[in-house]
Amino acid sequence: MKSLPPEMRQILGDCYPHIRELNPAQRSAIEAGYLESEDNYIIAIPTASGKTLLGIIAALKTVMEGGRVIYTVPLLSIQNEKIKEFRKLEEHGIRVGKDPRTSDIAVMVFESFDSLTRFSWNILREVDLLIVDEFHMIGEYTRGPVIESAITRARTLNPSVRIVALSATLSNMDEIAGWLDARVVEHDYRPVPLHREVLDTEMFGVREKNDVVLKVLERSLEDGSQTLAFVSTRRFTESLASHLADKISGKIPDDMVESFREVAGKVLEVPKSRGSPPTSTCLKLAECLEAGIAFHHAGLFNRQREIIEDEFRDGNILMITATPSLMYGVNLPSRTVVIRDYTRWTSQGPRRIPVFDYEQMSGRAGRPQYDDAGYSYLIARSHDEAMDLEEYYIRGEVERTTSRIIENRDALYRQIIAQVASGLSGTTEELADFFRNTFYGYQMVEGPFSDSFGMDSIQYEVENATEYLMRNRILYPGPEGFSATEFGLLIAKSNYSVETAIKLHQFASEMDEMDIYRLIYEITRTPDMPLISFKGRKSRDPVRDKLMEHGLFLMDVGNEEATAAALIEWINERTEYEIENAFHVYAASTRRSAYEASKIVKFFGKICEIMGVYRHSSQLEILSARLYYGVKEDAIPLVVGVRGLGRVRARKIIKTFGEDLRHVREDELKRIDGIGPKMAGAIRRYCERF
């Protein structure tokens, strides 16, 4: 810390009292001129090695000099985590928030920052420092194109902005640094040494990989540590957790039994608090938790996932079995990481996970301040396979990071629309110039694998994409270049994919009368809709039958159809328990799917308006509300008008008193289960107003 200015040392000492000295990786950055220089920097150091503190040091320097900072992250969960961490700075007069207009340090998700670069140029031009956390995601299919395009626009509109990229180590760092015009600080320091090993069934004389995981768990139980186990699918998270819980339950020390039961009780309370009995998935989770094992996937209630994460941090869970998506969204280090599955299913069949993903999962092992070492175990079926995996993953090199902006066609279309709608590009030449400045363009024209046809390739991709957008009436050509149609402007100002917009536009053009059930089904077929998935291979006839009841005759039944059936039941006030039992789906995610469907219905309404179709507006507003609140039409005024009432209590009120509540007294309302004096008063005030 001695190398930092006194005022900065004071702030950091107050906000991060556990940090006494900079670690070797942080010192190497300071010694490389990171604090004094205005150059762009890529900080490439391992997980948990202090990247965030280096970001804060740069941010403090900028704010102390009167500047503004935007700190970008990939996910809302990380945004909330960072804001909570940075709030300590407010004690020193530094404003922290999500809005760059009112914050000295604004924490934004990538998509929000991308939107800022399109339409909020004045704000962007006031930003002095852009910090890009999890920058290594620039090679990821979905978010990578967003990162590189937003950075490119930001540098075009505000050439003086300084960029600090916080990243894992990438194999082609020099190439990436060339694009960013950045200096690179790489260091292999880890606060907790990491031991990586491949285990196989033959070592332990067992037949199944699950039994190898059990051996690791038993060792963790002996030394009082915790384990994260990664598998490839939701179903495997549950089957592994159940297997381990069954095997370990008789070996749990008495002093742990009660705390495990308390955690199990907490997850069972979640559906009850939402008016639903626990689903079979909830019951299975609670049963596993009584043995200290949790499974973690998107098919659980959000609150249940939060409980699992918090209790794991507090040491009240021995092991979490999870899919690899956990490594991106949640900061959950543990002493031991087990990677049971090293393949994932693709359209071409099973494929090995990248070395980069293996590194990210392994990097979770070892908790700073708690562990003297971290242990990562990859599981193989045989000794020969173990040797192969050791060569591939432990000794192998991380793959070269490449731009995905052309591979992800929707990302290409969205960035072209953004450029045209914002007035930054109007011709194919100007669009090609924009893409020339992206990471994709740098790799095509200046990278080590570039060739003399790089610019021609960019021009070709742009021309193909603009033709597609003109065919779909998103762009139209004029004497001075392209302009965005009303439809194109709507897409540019939304967060929806071009494919979603085109599908909904097509449906609106073919629709004579409003059929809300057909609309729900069409929404589930858009790529922006989070789907509710089947739990196993049980009969799918109940889903087919439910859709047939509402005039939807379908031969093939998959997750899209399951989601449509679940949403139809949701707006008819069925509980998650009833939906799961009826259709054999992960119904805990119904609420999230319904929320997203509600927003897509509003987007569909805007599409109808720009097409001049207004006769469905009222029905669409009603459907959006029904999806959002999960109610029949008669309950909408009550759940909308009385904040926090919820659909269960609203239905009890309507059943008891009918829809006309003008003459119902507060004492009568309080007789209904779940309604206390405060809520009764709120209901009366609502009735008096309306």
UniProtKB/Swiss-Prot annotation:
Single GO MF descriptor: ATP hydrolysis activity
Domain Helicase C-terminal residues, every copy: 208-417
Positions of the Helicase ATP-binding domain: 32-188
Metal-binding is among the record's keywords: no
Annotated SUPFAM superfamilies: P-loop containing nucleoside triphosphate hydrolases, Sec63 N-terminal domain-like, Winged helix' DNA-binding domain
Keyword Heme: no
Stored Gene3D superfamilies: 1.10.3380.30, 5' to 3' exonuclease, C-terminal subdomain, P-loop containing nucleotide triphosphate hydrolases
Positions that bind ATP: 26, 45-52
GO biological process, one term: DNA repair
Superkingdom, taxonomy of origin: Archaea
E.C. code: 5.6.2.4
Enzyme class: isomerase
Annotated consequence of substituting residue 649 to A: Decreased DNA-binding to replication forks, decreased ssDNA-stimulated ATPase. Decreased helicase activity. No binding to RPA
Reported function: DNA-dependent ATPase and 3'-5' DNA helicase that may be involved in repair of stalled replication forks. Helicase with 3'-to 5'- polarity; able to unwind over 100 bp of DNA at 50 degrees Celsius. Unwinds forked DNA, preferentially on lagging strand forks; has weaker activity on Holliday junctions. Displaces the invading strand in DNA D-loops. Unwinds short oligonucleotides from dsDNA with 3'- but not blunt ends or 5'-ssDNA tails in an ATP-dependent manner.
Entry's family note: Belongs to the helicase family. Hel308 subfamily.
Protein known as: ATP-dependent DNA helicase Hel308
Encoding gene (name): hel308
